[in-house]
Amino acid sequence: MKKVRIGAVVAEFNYDITHMMLELAKEHARFLDAEITRVIAVPGVFDMPLAVKKLLLEDEIDAVITLGAVIEGATDHDQIVVQHASRKIADLALDYDKPVALGISGPGMTRLEAHQRVDYAKRAVEAAVKMYRRLKEDI
């Protein structure tokens, strides 16, 4: 079975959390006989769609994961960021016929909750690998 080549888009905002997510994602990818071959760091979750699109255009990338932590603030900004980014990210998967998995925690969570949810990175890798392999089975 071919090793799945994954591109990762990682938010720099809350980097203490997203860096842990990236390391966990790399480790889990190896466990699943996949590899994170390319990483693009972006300022925040809202900035992810353009980087996701760039990775989807690369022939050497089979699937993409997004890693971010959106922590609740004094306004509804966290809700808006996650809703808009996740919608556009899902649209890109459909537009480019490649799996894109969300490893974004939030909205509406505290910093402590974000630290407790770093395993969303593993879920994203798992979803990306499963989707890639299942879509290839039908060809």
Swiss-Prot record:
Active site: 77 (proton donor)
GO cellular component annotations of the record: riboflavin synthase complex
UniProt keyword list: Riboflavin biosynthesis, Transferase
Pfam families assigned: DMRL_synthase
Entry's EC annotation: 2.5.1.78
GO-annotated molecular function: 6,7-dimethyl-8-ribityllumazine synthase activity
One GO BP: riboflavin biosynthetic process
Classification via InterPro entries: LS, LS/RS, LS/RS_sf
Catalytic activities: (2S)-2-hydroxy-3-oxobutyl phosphate + 5-amino-6-(D-ribitylamino)uracil = 6,7-dimethyl-8-(1-D-ribityl)lumazine + phosphate + 2 H2O + H(+)
Superkingdom of the organism of origin: Archaea
Binding-site residues, 5-amino-6-(D-ribitylamino)uracil: 13, 45-47, 69-71, 102
Binding residue positions for (2S)-2-hydroxy-3-oxobutyl phosphate: 74-75, 117
Pathway(s) where this gene product acts: Cofactor biosynthesis; riboflavin biosynthesis; riboflavin from 2-hydroxy-3-oxobutyl phosphate and 5-amino-6-(D-ribitylamino)uracil: step 1/2
Family classification: Belongs to the DMRL synthase family.
Biological function: Catalyzes the formation of 6,7-dimethyl-8-ribityllumazine by condensation of 5-amino-6-(D-ribitylamino)uracil with 3,4-dihydroxy-2-butanone 4-phosphate. This is the penultimate step in the biosynthesis of riboflavin.
HAMAP family: Lumazine_synth
Protein name (Swiss-Prot/TrEMBL): 6,7-dimethyl-8-ribityllumazine synthase
Origin species: Methanothermobacter thermautotrophicus (strain ATCC 29096 / DSM 1053 / JCM 10044 / NBRC 100330 / Delta H) (Methanobacterium thermoautotrophicum)
